[in-house]
Amino acid sequence: NYPAAIGFLTRGCVNRCPWCVVPRKEGALRGNADIEEFLDGRRNAVLLDNNVLASGWGLEQIEKIIRLGARVDFNQGLDARQIARNPPIAELLSRVKWMRYIRMAYDSTAVRDDVRKAIERLKKCGMKPAKMFFYVLVREVDDALARIEELDALGCQPFAQPYRDFTGGTKPSREAWRLAYWC
């Protein structure tokens, strides 16, 4: 009797981030389910999509979520690059009722410009930085700390996530765990 529906609107991802298992595990990005299939009369949904913004089907489902008035949490995070590079997406997301935060990822300094642009686009659409939550992948502690401090200075909510590979060969360092606990 969980108060929120849980499910995937899409599966897969268009990106091939070297640290991510999603493309290997789920394959190419594709539609998976209609929000009404698992909302089942509830008003809240925790959505586990990995790159819903890169999918036409996913964007249609977000429009439907808005029409239904459902509150959502894209728990795996949204791709800030999609928001930065497609201005209408920021406007679309500004009309969503969020359960708590709009979640995104800031996994490396390579996406710094896109992250900053996504934050600015969302702010222009009326979203407050305090409602913007960012997963921060921790591989190199100093680099992750710089990204955390940058997000904090922008008024956003960073969440440090120590990296571990899927073969078990790489485990987070003690410093990475300390950073995560501190953050």
What are these regions (language model features)?
Residues N1-I6:
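Glycine-rich beta-alpha loop elements in corrinoid/cobalamin-binding modules
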Residues V21-A118, P129-R139, Q157-P162:
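Core AdoMet radical
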Residues R11, I66, W98, S173-R174:
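Alpha-helical protein-protein interaction elements
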Residues C125-M127:
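Short helix-capping segments at alpha-helix termini
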Residues L137-C183:
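Auxiliary Fe-S-binding modules of radical SAM enzymes
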Residues F8-P23:
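Local cysteine-cluster metal-coordination motifs and their immediate loop/turn environment
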Residues I66, K123, E149-D152:
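Anion (oxyanion) recognition and catalysis
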